[in-house]
Regions:
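Left-handed beta-helix
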Residues: 58, 63-64, 69-72, 77-78, ...
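Short, intrinsically disordered/low-complexity patches at protein termini
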Residues: 32, 37-39, 85, 99-100, ...
Length: 129
């Protein structure tokens, strides 16, 4: 089982795994690009969101700035939107339903820190629906 599979199933995993590091880096680069686009650059924003949120069919309206750990673990329903400073710590899957309006400065967080000292080198996560 890969570290990503462990992470998504809620098991202890190594967050320094190369695949996970590359996915996080990619998501942060895309979010940074999105945040730097002007609101009238809708085609560019759409292209970035398609890459950042590949599993979302109907893209939401996201008011920049936005932040994601992975992006590919976040799923938006139809006609959803999020105001500025929207943060998704999508270590586990995040499912946002249809017609959801998210206010400013909202964080959706799935990571669960491990409380035992000998396990703190690892993290776990739970899905958020």
């Amino acid at each position: 089982m890969t570290e990503r599979e462990k992470m998504l199933s809620g098991e202890l995993y190594d967050s320094s795994d190369n695949e996970l590091e590359q996915l996080r880096l990619h998501a942060r680069k895309l979010a940074r690009r999105y945040n730097l686009t002007d609101e009238d650059q809708q085609e560019v924003q759409t292209q970035i969101l398609r890459e950042l949120l590949p599993a979302t069919e109907e893209l939401p309206y996201l008011q920049a700035p936005v932040y994601f750990d992975y992006g590919c673990h976040t799923y938006f329903g139809k006609y959803s939107s999020a105001n500025f400073n929207f943060t998704c710590l999508d270590v586990g899957e995040i499912h946002i339903g249809d017609n959801v309006m998210i206010g400013p400065n909202v964080t959706l967080a799935t990571p669960m820190p491990v409380s035992y000292t000998h396990l703190r080198a690892h993290e776990t996560a739970a899905n958020l629906v």
